[in-house]
Amino acid sequence: MRSHSGSAAQVTNGRHTLGSWLASAAVVARASPMDTPPWHPSPIQTRTGIWTGIETHWARAHGRFLVMGVRPLQSVRSEPFQKSWIFLPRIMADKLTRIAIVNHDKCKPKKCRQECKKSCPVVRMGKLCIEVTPQCKIVWISETLCIGCGICIKKCPFGALSIVNLPSNLEKETTHRYCANAFKLHRLPIPRPGEVLGLVGTNGIGKSTALKILAGKQKPNLGKYDDPPDWQEILTYFRGSELQNYFTKILEDDLKAIIKPQYVDQIPKAAKGTVGSILDRKDETKTQAIVCQQLDLTHLRERNVEDLSGGELQRFACAVVCIQKADIFMFDEPSSYLDVKQRLKAAITIRSLINPDRYIIVVEHDLSVLDYLSDFICCLYGVPSAYGVVTMPFSVREGINIFLDGYVPTENLRFRDASLVFKVAETANEEEVKKMCMYKYPGMRKKMGEFELAIVAGEFTDSEIMVMLGENGTGKTTFIRMLAGRLKPDEGGEVPVLNVSYKPQKISPKSTGSVRQLLHEKIRDAYTHPQFVTDVMKPLQIENIIDQEVQTLSGGELQRVALALCLGKPADVYLIDEPSAYLDSEQRLMAARVVKRFILHAKKTAFVVEHDFIMATYLADRVIVFDGVPSKNTVANSPQTLLAGMNKFLSQLEITFRRDPNNYRPRINKLNSIKDVEQKKSGNYFFLDD
């Protein structure tokens, strides 16, 4: 072997020269085609994708170097090739800690040929980097031996593998890991007594894991899943931080924790009986009457739990937690299914629990409610289902803005490419609406038992989104069913005949097959259409879950599938009832963009029922305000502009909103604050000025 001192060997592929790139970073030795180093393994034909036009001939770790044999691809060779040996300093690889994630649902060794193991360069060199046989339930990947070439990811026929590079400084801060090749949580939120801690982050980033650990229901293993540490070692690890005293109190049984579950629609399966009987049984603080009045549950005491709607179940679950004696109160998404008024009442009820000796932790994706509810914020970032990192506590405004901006200034770290900015929809002026008018509906009345709905005549156009604003029980769904011709009005004129596609509020999967089978059965033509794939399937990330069983999907995954099914059906009008339920803040904005883009391209009309104020203002071209007494007498007003409609709706609720100057997100003013009083005096309940 003849080495060239001071310069790197040139391997030209017609487009790039390796030498110029490698000269400062590696020592390269060139050999003739017949020369081989003494440690040369058998040649393998793989492409690493590191350099265009170059393929790796072989690779091996040797001392302080990672040695690779490279040569130009056959298609770009212009002369008899020469092999080159590249010695990359191994420190380049050691700066990043790799974690290998294997998706337990997708990995099927019995149905594949173990392509991951056969194609791995490290395995070809005789090391056990990947272990799998047809009899295995799941593949195992050694994170210490893995060189991060990414070949196994591309070769896996089920897309079950992912290799994620992790900054090495986080390796010492691992709080919990479930098992090999599974999710890792780094750090923990630090709760403070007498204050409300808000947690914000995407789904699958470790918020529920953090809640379980802080509640004492999950013992943190500090990443040592094969040899879990004892509590003394855990307390030593947290020595000097507020969490040391916190866990010490939990171990001494000084702290009792209660968690309000995320999926309230599962409650009827576990709790049987009437609302009143369960509340009587759980009432340890004798505050049941006050809490029921605050959460509007008094009239529901005689109703069975299985007969409650989504919003009623949510309020019932919050009430059950609030009337018990505990030191740690945890609320996982307390605003799902609630309208704006109920969300604020729930927030006030949760804040009424504040006590100098109590810890309160809230996970919430409605940023307006989280802003109103919290005293300080911890953001969680990372790669969903791979790893999550908890930031230090921030003030409420700063914490939410850091999450939306995707940049943590204290760590000088960017965890998202683009910032999330909430801009209000451009409202068409009245003259344009008259010219584009496609459909008119007459004034109507409908009586159903004790409930009566009066509809004021109005009109809507194609390529327009109407957001319906009103409390639960004001007849929004009844209004749509009448427009669709499914309900006949008791009084009023003829309704235009329209085809309607409907996404219900409650999603209960009945399909027993995979997502792919469900889509093929329900929207066969749409889900393979290129325009639909671009506008709907890709942004909603349906491809990631398309081979999973429908029955095993999480709430957020079900919501995305239901939205795709609704938009995939050919219709004149699309009714979408609460598309934001169970979606995180990023997914909510993406779902809003999907609906907006689809309606624009398809030239159809959408009626959206949405209680997340940020999403409602983003979606709305015009709004229909429902007022009156819920479940008794209500009126559906004619469509109004966004500003006029929002002002009317918020004046009924006696709530004022302002906008954040950085990202324009709506923020609820604290009751009787200077801003709140000023806006109420001027009549600007919804403040749009930048």
Regions found by a protein language model. Give the residues of each.
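ABC-family P-loop ATPase nucleotide-binding domains
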Residues: T175-A180, H186, N221-L313, Q324, ...
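ABC ATPase nucleotide-binding domain signature region
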Residues: N169, R192-K286, D366-R397, E459-Q531, ...
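ABC ATPase nucleotide-binding domains
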Residues: L197-V200, V390-A457, D462, V635-D690
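Walker B catalytic motif
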Residues: N304, F331-P334, K341, I350, ...
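Hydrophobic anchor residue at the start of the ABC signature
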Residues: A317-C318, A346, L563, A591
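Iron-sulfur cluster-binding cysteine motifs and their immediate structural context
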Residues: P37, R113-Q135, W140, I151-S168
